[in-house]
From Swiss-Prot:
It is found in: Postsynaptic cell membrane; Cell membrane. Residues 1-19 form the signal peptide. The keyword Acyltransferase does not apply. This is Acetylcholine receptor subunit alpha-type acr-16. The gene is acr-16. Disulfide bonds join 147-161, 211-212. GO terms for molecular function: acetylcholine-gated monoatomic cation-selective channel activity; excitatory extracellular ligand-gated monoatomic ion channel activity; transmembrane signaling receptor activity; transmitter-gated monoatomic ion channel activity involved in regulation of postsynaptic membrane potential. One of its GO terms (cellular component) is neuron projection. Keywords: Cell membrane, Disulfide bond, Glycoprotein, Ion channel, Ion transport, Ligand-gated ion channel, Membrane, Postsynaptic cell membrane, Receptor, Signal, Synapse, Transmembrane, Transmembrane helix, Transport. Glycans are attached at residues 43, 93.
Length: 499
C-alpha cells in the first residue's frame, strides 16, 4: 500500500514540474524578441482597437465647495496583441498567463479631468493574456475628478459629472479607443447615502485640433447624480420654516409684555445662522444662487420686515396726545377701514359699512369741536368777569358790615340811619351768598372740565393703542400669507422634492 502511495505522489510531482516547465517555456517564447514599446499591430498603418469599460464601485464624496467628486471604480481594458498568440496544445493546454504592468505594451489612456496629485491614481495590477492574444487589464483606483457643480436648485439638484478617458500621445489613427459593451457597469455599485444614481451613460467623441489633421478620440462616462433631500429637509428646511413661523408669534404678543422686539431679533439671528451654514456648503460662485439660499434669504427678509413693523407697532402703542396728533387719514384707515376689513371688534364701537367714513375725509366734527372750544373760551372769560364782580361785591359787603358794626358801637348815631344801613346789609348778604355759590359752581365746572379733558386724552391714547393692535393684526395676516406663498412658490419650482 505504501508503495502505491509513493508512486502516485511521484506522478503528481512530475506533472507539476512538467506543467511549470511548459509555462516557463511559454513565457520565454512570448517574451523572445518582444518589445513593449511596439504597438501590437501587424501593419503599422492600422490602429490598435482598445475597448474600455468602467465598473463603478462607490461614490465616496462630492465636494461641492471645491467641485471635486471622489469615486472608487475599476477600469476594464481589452485589446489584442498579435505578438502574444500561442497554440494551447503545444504548451500543455495553458489558456492564459499573467504579466506585470509595464512588461508588455499597454495603452497610455489617462483620465483627462483628474485632479489627483499623482494624476494617474490607478493600481498597476497584472495583465491577463489569453492564447488568442486578447489582453485583459483591470486596474482599480480611487479617482478624483473635477466636476462643474450646478447649485441653482440645491438641495434639490441633479449633477452630471463624467470621466473623460483618452490616449495621451496616440491619435485616432494609431489607437482607436472604443467603449466596451455595457460600458458603465454598476452591478457592484454600493449606494451612496447622499446621492442617488438614476442614470449612467457612455459617449464617444472625436476632437480635431488646429495643429493636426488627425482625430483624437475620447470616451465620456457620465454620472447622473440626484441628491437625496431627506437630510436637508429635516436638518435645515424644517427648522428654518418653524423658526420663521415664530415671527408670527411676535404679532400676537401684547406690546406691554416687553418681549416683543426681543423675540423678533432672536429669530433674525437664528435665520442668519442657518444662512451661514448654507453659504459654507455652497461653492464660492456668482453664477447662480442656490434655491435653499433664496429660501433662507426670503426668510431673513420676512424676519427683518417683521422686526421693523414690530418697532412701528411699539411706536404707535406708546404715543400720547401731548406728542402726536392722529391725522384724519390715519384715523379713518386704522380705526375704521382696516378693522372692518379684518373683522376686528372694539368694545363700544359697532363698525358697519354704512358707518365707515370716507378714507380721505377730514377729521370728523372738527368745526363743531372748534365752535364748542370758542364757546367754552367765552364762557371762561365771562366766568372770570363774574368772578371779578363777585369779588368786588363781596369786598363791599365786608366793608359795609364793618361800618355797620362801627356805627352800632357809637351811640351818637341816629337809629334811623342804622336801620337803613342794616337793610342795605341784608341785600348785600344775599348777593354775597349767591356769589359764593357761583364761585363754587365755577370751581366744580373747572374740575369737570379737567375730568372731561382727561377722558379725551385717555380716549386718544386708546385710539393709538387700538391702531397698534390693528397694525399688529394686519401684519399677522400679511406675513402668514407671504410665508406660505413664498415657501410653496420656492420649493414648487424645484425639479423634484424627494429622491
Amino acid at each position: 500500500m505504501s508503495s502505491v502511495c509513493a508512486l502516485l505522489l511521484s506522478c503528481a510531482l512530475f506533472l507539476v514540474a512538467h506543467g511549470s516547465l511548459q509555462e516557463r517555456r511559454l513565457y520565454e517564447d512570448l517574451m523572445r524578441n518582444y518589445n513593449n514599446l511596439e504597438r501590437p499591430v501587424a501593419n503599422h498603418s492600422e490602429p490598435v482597437t482598445v475597448h474600455l469599460k468602467v465598473a463603478l464601485q462607490q461614490i465616496i464624496d462630492v465636494d461641492e465647495k471645491n467641485q471635486v467628486v471622489y469615486v472608487n471604480a475599476w477600469l476594464d481594458y481589452t485589446w489584442k496583441d498579435y505578438n502574444l498568440v500561442w497554440d494551447q496544445a503545444e504548451y500543455g493546454n495553458i489558456t492564459d498567463v499573467r504579466f506585470p504592468a509595464g512588461k508588455i505594451w499597454k495603452p497610455d489612456v489617462l483620465l483627462y479631468n483628474s485632479v489627483d496629485t499623482n494624476f494617474d491614481s490607478t493600481y498597476q495590477t497584472n495583465m491577463i493574456v489569453y492564447s488568442s492574444g486578447l489582453v485583459h487589464w483591470v486596474p482599480p483606483g480611487i479617482f478624483k475628478i473635477s466636476c462643474k457643480i450646478d447649485i441653482q436648485w440645491f438641495p434639490f439638484d441633479e449633477q452630471k459629472c463624467f470621466f473623460k478617458f483618452g490616449s495621451w500621445t496616440y491619435d485616432g489613427y494609431k489607437l482607436d479607443l472604443q467603449p466596451a459593451t455595457g460600458g458603465f457597469d454598476i452591478s457592484e455599485y454600493l449606494p451612496n447615502g447622499e446621492w442617488a444614481l438614476p442614470l449612467t451613460t457612455v459617449e464617444r467623441n472625436e476632437k480635431f485640433y488646429d495643429c493636426c489633421p488627425e482625430p483624437y478620440p475620447d470616451v465620456h462616462f457620465y454620472l447622473h447624480m440626484r441628491r437625496r433631500t431627506l437630510y436637508y429637509g429635516f436638518n435645515l428646511i424644517m427648522p428654518c420654516i418653524l423658526t420663521t413661523l415664530m415671527t408670527l408669534l411676535g404679532f400676537t404678543l401684547p406690546p406691554d409684555a416687553g418681549e416683543k422686539i426681543t423675540l423678533q431679533i432672536t429669530v433674525l439671528l437664528s435665520i442668519c445662522f442657518f444662512l451661514s451654514i448654507v453659504s459654507e456648503m455652497s461653492p464660492p460662485t456668482s453664477e447662480a444662487v442656490p434655491l435653499l439660499g433664496i429660501f433662507f434669504t426670503c426668510c431673513m427678509i420676512v424676519v427683518t420686515a417683521s422686526t421693523v413693523f414690530t418697532v412701528y407697532v411699539l411706536n404707535l402703542h406708546y404715543r400720547t396726545p401731548e406728542t402726536h396728533d392722529m391725522g384724519p387719514w390715519t384715523r379713518n384707515l386704522l380705526l375704521y377701514w382696516i378693522p372692518w376689513i379684518l373683522r376686528m371688534k372694539r368694545p363700544g364701537h359697532n363698525l358697519t359699512y354704512a358707518s365707515l367714513p370716507s378714507l380721505f375725509a377730514s377729521k370728523p366734527n372738527r368745526h363743531s369741536e372748534s365752535l364748542i372750544r370758542n364757546i367754552k373760551d367765552n364762557e371762561h372769560s365771562l366766568s372770570r368777569a363774574n368772578s371779578f364782580d363777585a369779588d368786588c361785591r363781596l369786598n363791599q359787603y365786608i366793608m359795609t358790615q364793618s361800618v355797620s358794626n362801627g356805627l352800632t358801637s357809637m351811640g351818637s348815631i341816629p337809629s334811623t340811619m342804622i336801620s337803613s344801613t342794616n337793610g342795605a346789609l341784608t341785600d348785600v348778604s344775599q348777593q354775597a351768598t349767591l356769589l359764593i355759590l357761583h364761585r363754587i359752581y365755577h370751581e366744580l365746572k373747572i374740575v369737570t372740565k379737567r375730568m372731561i379733558e382727561g377722558d379725551k386724552e385717555e380716549q386718544a391714547s386708546n385710539n393709538w393703542k387700538f391702531a397698534a393692535m390693528v397694525v399688529d393684526r394686519l401684519c399677522l395676516y400679511v406675513f402668514t400669507i407671504f410665508i406660505i406663498a413664498s415657501t410653496i412658490g420656492i420649493f414648487w419650482s424645484a425639479p423634484y422634492l424627494v429622491a
